Amino acid sequence: MTCRTRFAPSPTGYLHIGGARTALYCWLEARHRGGEFVLRIEDTDRERSTQGAIDAILEAMEWLGLDYDEGPIYQTDRVARYLEVAEQLVADGKAYYAYETREELDAMREAAMAKQEKPRYNGAARELGLPRKDDPNRVIRFKNPLQGTVVFDDLIKGRIEIANSELDDMVIFRPDGFPTYNFAVVVDDWDMGITEVIRGDDHINNTPRQINLYEGIGAPVPKFGHMPMILDEQGAKLSKRTGAADVMQYKDAGYLPDALLSYLARLGWSHGDQELFSRQELIELFDVKDCNSKASRLDMAKLGWVNQHFLKTEDVAAIVPHLVYQLQKLGLDVAAGPAPEDVVIALRERVQTLKEMAEKAVVWYQPLTEYDEAAVAKHFKAGAEVALGKARELLAALPEWTAEAVGVALHDTAAALEMGMGKVAQPLRVAITGTQVSPDISHTVYLAGRDQALKRIDVAITKVATA
C-alpha cells in the first residue's frame, strides 16, 4: 500500500513553528517511504478562516520547499460530499437527527454536573428515529458505540485505550449546514486514501472519536502518530514572544529554509548524535517511529548555530536569492553594488544570519557617509596618505578587477613601501567601509567596485591631509 500523509492546517492564522514541524514530518514520512504528500486546507470554520491565512500558509510551504503531490484541497469545496456520507449514516441507522435547543443542551450538561458526571449529550434523540425537517436547531449526531474500548497503537506514544462510555454521540453536521471538524477529516482521509496521520498531541483526544467514525463509514483506519508540543527555552508553552512566530518571520530574521528544517527535524526526532542534516539526509533517515514522546524545547542559540553552519556550507547559488531578499528588504538596489554571490563568499564565515549579512553589506550598495570616529583617529594619522596613495595608484592600473588581482595590488603596495600589510590594510579598510572591522581587505576593496573604491580612497586621503 502506498504511504499517503497529509498536512491539514486550519487557515485561522499564519503557519507557526509547531505547524511547520508537523508539515515537515508528514512530508518526510511520505518522501522516505516513496509515498505521496497531500495538502488539505480545513476551512469549514467560516467565521475564523480567512483568505489571508490561506495565502500565508501556502507562501510558507513554498519557502520551506515542502512540495505536495495533491492539493491544496479545500474542505469548503466538499460540503456536498460530507452531507452525502452523513445522510447515508442516518439511512444505515448509524446516525440520527436531533433538534434540541441550546437551552435544552445546557440543561443536560448542568444535570450531569449536578450528579458529578462528565457533562455531555445524554442521547435523548438516539432511538427516536426523528425525520429530517426544517429546524434552526437541526443537527446530525453519530451513534457512538455504547460498549467496548477504542484501542490504537500510536506510532509515537504507544498503545492508547479509551472506553466508549467516555464518549458521547457527537454532532457530525451542524445547524449551519456544515460538517464538524471530526467528521470532515474522517471523510477526507477516507476519500484521499490517507494511511498515516501525523499531528500534534493536542489532537489525541479526537482520535478515539475519529476511529469510531472511520469504522462507522466503513473506511480503513489510518495509523496515528501524535507529536508532543514544542516548549520555549524555559519549558513553558510557546508564545509569539518566545518563538511561536509566523514561519515567515524566521525568513525575515535571516534563516535559511534548509537550516530551519534541519533544526525543526531535531525538535522531536533524532538519528544517533547527528545534529545537522541536509534535506536529502532527512528523507533517507526519517522514520516517525523514531520520534520522541516527550516535549522538546526551542533553543534560538542552537538555531543560530545551525543556520551559521548552513551559511558556511550550502552552495552559494542556493543562498543568493535569500540574500537578495534581505538586501531588498533594506531598500537597497542590488544592481547598484557587487554581485550577491561575491557578498556571500566574503561574509558567509562571519555571520549567523542573512539579515546580519545584508546589514554588513550595506556599505557596498550605497554611498559611504559616516565614519567611525575611533577608527579615523587610529588609522587616518599623518603618513597614512602614503599607503593610501600607493594603493590607489596600483588599483587604478589593474587591467582586471577581481578579488585576487586586488589582493596582489595591495601586497605589492606593502612591498613597495617596505611596510607591514596591516599598515596598508587598516587605513584602506576605514577608507572603504568607514570602520576598522570588515572581511579580508582584498574582498573589502573588491566589493566596493573600482570606481567607488578609488573615490573613497580619494576622500580618505583628503581626510588624512586635513586631520
Swiss-Prot record:
InterPro entries, per database record: aa-tRNA-synth_I_cd-bd (IPR045462), aa-tRNA-synth_I_codon-bd_sub2 (IPR020751), aa-tRNA-synth_I_CS (IPR001412), aa_tRNA-synth_I_cd-bd_sf (IPR008925), Glu-tRNA-ligase_bac/mito (IPR004527), Glu/Gln-tRNA-synth (IPR000924), Glu/Gln-tRNA-synth_Ib_cat-dom (IPR020058), GluQ/Sye (IPR049940)
Protein name: Glutamate--tRNA ligase
Record keywords: Aminoacyl-tRNA synthetase, ATP-binding, Cytoplasm, Ligase, Nucleotide-binding, Protein biosynthesis
PROSITE patterns xref list: AA_TRNA_LIGASE_I
Main location: cytoplasm
A GO molecular-function descriptor: tRNA binding
Top-tier EC class: ligase
Short sequence motif named 'KMSKS' region, residue ranges: 237-241
Gene Ontology cellular-component annotations: cytosol
PANTHER family to which the protein is assigned, alphabetical: GLUTAMATE--TRNA LIGASE, GLUTAMATE--TRNA LIGASE, MITOCHONDRIAL-RELATED
Record Gene3D superfamilies: 1.10.10.350, HUPs
Alphabetical list of NCBIfam families matching this protein: gltX_bact (TIGR00464)
Location of the protein in the cell: Cytoplasm
Subunit and interaction comment: Monomer.
Organism field: Stenotrophomonas maltophilia (strain R551-3)
UniProt lineage: Bacteria, Pseudomonadati, Pseudomonadota, Gammaproteobacteria, Lysobacterales
GO biological process: glutamyl-tRNA aminoacylation
Amino-acid positions noted as binding ATP in the UniProt annotation, renumbered to this chain: K240
Motif ('HIGH' region): 9-19
A Pfam family of this chain: Anticodon_2
Annotated family: Belongs to the class-I aminoacyl-tRNA synthetase family. Glutamate--tRNA ligase type 1 subfamily.
Transmembrane segments: none
Function: Catalyzes the attachment of glutamate to tRNA(Glu) in a two-step reaction: glutamate is first activated by ATP to form Glu-AMP and then transferred to the acceptor end of tRNA(Glu).
Catalytic activity: tRNA(Glu) + L-glutamate + ATP = L-glutamyl-tRNA(Glu) + AMP + diphosphate
Record-listed E.C. numbers: 6.1.1.17
CDD domains registered for this protein in UniProt: GluRS_core (cd00808)
